């Protein structure tokens, strides 16, 4: 018998997360490591679990995810986005709850590029009067 799985892809900053939801007890594996081992900060762990918590599906699904690129914050955001998309595929009625929470919207904010003549994206060189 084939196992039921729901897939979702999430993106945030430079990070891309491929998420697979399978029926289970609520275990979250990221790049073959447990969530407690992968993320150091409790805020990031809470951020990843938020779509499951808000829809009361934390104990119904196991999350198996592959994340690449970016830093920890971007990866946590990408996971949240991917989990939300996979949850809508599992049950279309959850879409309204996730949409109201803003989890289905791709956060389009990216790092601003450095411009020539400046030290950073907006920081100008130090002004010298003489």
Curated annotation (Swiss-Prot):
Transmembrane segments: none annotated. GO terms for cellular component: cytosolic small ribosomal subunit. The keyword 4Fe-4S does not apply. Pfam families: Ribosomal_S9. SUPFAM superfamilies: Ribosomal protein S5 domain 2-like. InterPro entries: Ribosomal_Su5_D2-typ_SF (IPR020568), Ribosomal_uS9 (IPR000754), Ribosomal_uS9_bac/plastid (IPR023035), Ribosomal_uS9_CS (IPR020574), Ribsml_uS5_D2-typ_fold_subgr (IPR014721). GO terms for biological process: translation. Keywords: Ribonucleoprotein, Ribosomal protein. It comes from the Bacteria. GO terms for molecular function: RNA binding; structural constituent of ribosome. Belongs to the universal ribosomal protein uS9 family. HAMAP family: Ribosomal_uS9_B. This is Small ribosomal subunit protein uS9. It comes from Alkaliphilus oremlandii (strain OhILAs) (Clostridium oremlandii (strain OhILAs)). The gene is rpsI.
């Amino acid at each position: 018998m084939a196992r039921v799985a729901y897939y979702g892809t999430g993106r945030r900053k430079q990070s891309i997360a491929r998420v697979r939801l399978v029926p289970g007890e609520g275990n979250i594996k990221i790049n073959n490591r447990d969530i407690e081992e992968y993320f150091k900060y409790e805020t990031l762990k809470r951020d990843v679990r938020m779509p499951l918590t808000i829809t009361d599906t934390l104990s119904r699904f196991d999350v198996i995810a592959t994340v690449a690129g970016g830093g920890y914050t971007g990866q946590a955001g990408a996971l949240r986005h991917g989990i939300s998309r996979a949850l809508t595929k599992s049950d279309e009625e959850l879409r309204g709850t996730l949409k109201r929470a803003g989890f289905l919207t791709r956060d389009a904010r990216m790092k601003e590029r450095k411009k020539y003549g400046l030290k950073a994206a907006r920081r100008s060189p130090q002004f010298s009067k003489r």
